[in-house]
Amino acid sequence: MQKVVKLNNIKIGNDLPFVLITGPCQIEGKDHALFMAEKLVKLTSKLEIPFIYKSSFDKANRTSVHGIRGVGIEKGLEILSKVKSEFDCPIVTDVHSESQCTETAEVADILQIPAFLCRQTDLLQAAAKTGKIVKVKKGQFLAPWDMKNVQTKLEAFGVKDILFTERGACFGYNNLVSDMRSLAIMAELNVPVVFDATHSVQQPGGLGGSTGGERKYVELLAKAATSVGIAGMYMEVHQDPDNAPSDGPCMMKLDNLESILIKLKKYDKITKEK
């Protein structure tokens, strides 16, 4: 029987209707976060899709030293707490160091381990100590079966609820590809698997001083992943992605999200029919 992770009234499992994890790449301020959350709560309620809000207080791995990193942990968590209380939605955000885990866990329901840090044992252990759900993004440099080692570490540290995320694999320079087999391979570890449709179209460092991306392929990859069968769909969105402070070329335009989700629900239903 496939593992099911429970978060409030949300059930996350590879055989269950997909959960949507979405929000802007980074926190840009309280007003923007509340604006985005309100739009996303209304949309997901209308479409009856379980929703988890995601946004980052720090983009610690920006390509350039001049890249905008975010509002920082103190202000960021204050804003995420406001989103959580005002819209009664669970929160996921990423942690980049052991020192951030305890403080972040006071607000976030899920701690996300960035792909570049997925093998950092001390970070995994610190996240585990919070007792929160731990969501690990598979490194672009890892085979899907290598995530067994990450799972073993987390379980050794006492984590009961683990989520894995596929976000593409390095394919030459400045390019990623998505191997849809990895979704099934990681699911065989009895861990709910999430597909990151927006970071999978990244072109890391492709713009020289920043990361490029091919937004036009987000829907295509999302359909493919949903056809395989996933526990969650991860998509970063923005009302004006071309002017967003980070990952603009990858993020979905908010106005286009509803039509894509309607299609994904159909794919998901067919895939999971008994």
UniProtKB/Swiss-Prot annotation:
Q: Family, per the entry?
A: Belongs to the KdsA family.
**Record's GO cellular component, any one?**
cytoplasm
Its annotated compartments are: Cytoplasm
Its recorded reaction(s) are: D-arabinose 5-phosphate + phosphoenolpyruvate + H2O = 3-deoxy-alpha-D-manno-2-octulosonate-8-phosphate + phosphate
Please, one GO biological process term? keto-3-deoxy-D-manno-octulosonic acid biosynthetic process
Q: Which UniProt keywords apply?
A: Cytoplasm, Lipopolysaccharide biosynthesis, Transferase
The record ties this protein, via InterPro entries, to:
Aldolase_TIM, DAHP1/KDSA, KDO8P_synthase
**Pathways involved:** Carbohydrate biosynthesis; 3-deoxy-D-manno-octulosonate biosynthesis; 3-deoxy-D-manno-octulosonate from D-ribulose 5-phosphate: step 2/3
User: Which NCBIfam families does this UniProt record tie to the protein?
Assistant: KDO8P_synth, PRK05198.1
A molecular function annotated in GO for this UniProt entry is: 3-deoxy-8-phosphooctulonate synthase activity
**In its UniProt entry, what is this protein called?**
2-dehydro-3-deoxyphosphooctonate aldolase
Which organism is this protein's natural source?
Rickettsia africae (strain ESF-5)
As recorded in UniProt, its EC number(s) are 2.5.1.55
Gene name in the database record: kdsA
Task: Supply the HAMAP family for this chain.
Answer: KDO8P_synth (MF_00056)
